[in-house]
Amino acid sequence: MMRLKQLNEMSASEFIHLLGGVFENSSWVAERAEPNRPYSSFQSLYNKMVEIVETASDNEQLKLIQMHPHLGTNVKITDFSQEEQKHAGLNELTKDEQNHLILLNQKYKDKFGFPFVMAVRGKIKQEIFRTIKERLQNNHQTEFKQALEEIKKIAMFRLQEIFREGENNSMTKHKERVMYYGKGDVFAYRTYLKPLTGVRTIPESPFSGRDHILFGVNVKISVGGTKLLTSFTKGDNSLVVATDSMKNFIQKHLASYTGTTIEGFLEYVATSFLKKYSHIEKISLIGEEIPFETTFAVKNGNRAASELVFKKSRNEYATAYLNMVRNEDNTLNITEQQSGLAGLQLIKVSGNSFVGFIRDEYTTLPEDSNRPLFVYLNIKWKYKNTEDSFGTNPENYVAAEQIRDIATSVFHETETLSIQHLIYLIGRRILERFPQLQEVYFESQNHTWDKIVEEIPESEGKVYTEPRPPYGFQCFTVTQEDLPHENILMFSDEPDHKGALK
């Protein structure tokens, strides 16, 4: 291993400087381990350092234990200890928890004469509180031995951290590898979330806000970082956040979320997760709305919307995506954010044509100057200012319901020459209504029905069936540069002199 080779070849002072903190503020362990180089493996190095501690005098062992800081302390501690306590959430204690831990630490030290030591990597604060209470019941000899055992565990984690960094540097210096893991289908439902109000209204849509009596979301989370490499290459789980923990994290944070949008919730989860787990370098979240529709009930003899009963929708739903990374200075940065509307299916029974396309020996599709058009649409949009997507300033927030209503309105108004033309016009209208958006992206599919009965006596109707399985699709991005006005063919409310719709 490259790092081990470097370790064996570096000077004595470099060796001691690198490993002096493996045992808390006790560089004498590294000093005594240095002359035994070269080491053949990580394990042989660790075994030698443990042997040095085990064969040290009682006084040296006591001083080693006393070098460890109290858990949850506010005084300056080593970088190793700071990171370990941060992983366990000890930097986020409430005032009451902080005072309780101080009291337990003092009781422990008063009884045994040295601080409570515990390898907190992978532990949660509740487990730490429980353990210190249990160990307060032990005698001095038992706790002295237990403290040394915990110190050995801590040393193992710290050595792994040092070797992991070296291995990560050597394995990723040529090309950044794909490396992430996560949890999908994290369903969370919240009743009585803060309502979304103050949204700017537009002519195409009656939408003005959401009451959020019932808020449902399906989240997919993935995380990554160079420190996770050995979880793949060596099965080392010491820095692995279990995906079940991710699920719990997301669901419980919906309870403390004070915002009003899926986009804002994803940002809240991402920020909280990276603050909680400082070794995670990047996080991606996808949120899909689980929509519920209003039902009606008779109240005092009148029909009115029910505030108790809702119907799960099988129709279109809002989506959001967010990617956040940790910078070298430990600040967090959103590298990508996108809002969306998925699963919108629209049928327009007339006023659609498809003519003038290439005809050759492969063409069997007839031209049609007035056909039904059934389209599936996924629409995604990006803001010029990412923070506008969170809904904290509702005047700048663009709701999926408004995007839906613009799409249906433009579809109704426009003499549709093709799906390509339709999505372009919808995108332009969206950007005209919402100049705070940077671009709108479309994924569309053509699911126009096949005609079965051409003419029905004394009726304008026809009979259709589902199309054959292959379907056409289109992808297109509309940007602010597309906004200069052009002539758009639209229906008027009145027929022309020939009886045809303009």
From Swiss-Prot:
Residues 179-502 are annotated as: Urate oxidase. SUPFAM superfamilies: Tetrahydrobiopterin biosynthesis enzymes-like (SSF55620), UraD-Like (SSF158694). Signal peptide: none annotated. One of its GO terms (molecular function) is urate oxidase activity. The active site is at 68 (proton donor), 183 (charge relay system), 194 (charge relay system), 243 (charge relay system). It comes from the Bacteria. CDD domains: Uricase. It catalyses: 5-hydroxy-2-oxo-4-ureido-2,5-dihydro-1H-imidazole-5-carboxylate + H(+) = (S)-allantoin + CO2; urate + O2 + H2O = 5-hydroxyisourate + H2O2. 5-hydroxy-2-oxo-4-ureido-2,5-dihydro-1H-imidazole-5-carboxylate binds at residues 69, 81-85, 116-120. Pathway: Purine metabolism; urate degradation; (S)-allantoin from urate: step 1/3; Purine metabolism; urate degradation; (S)-allantoin from urate: step 3/3. It holds the Pfam family OHCU_decarbox. Its EC number is 4.1.1.97, 1.7.3.3. NCBIfam families: UHCUDC, urate_oxi. In the N-terminal section; belongs to the OHCU decarboxylase family. This is Uric acid degradation bifunctional protein. It comes from Bacillus sp. (strain TB-90).
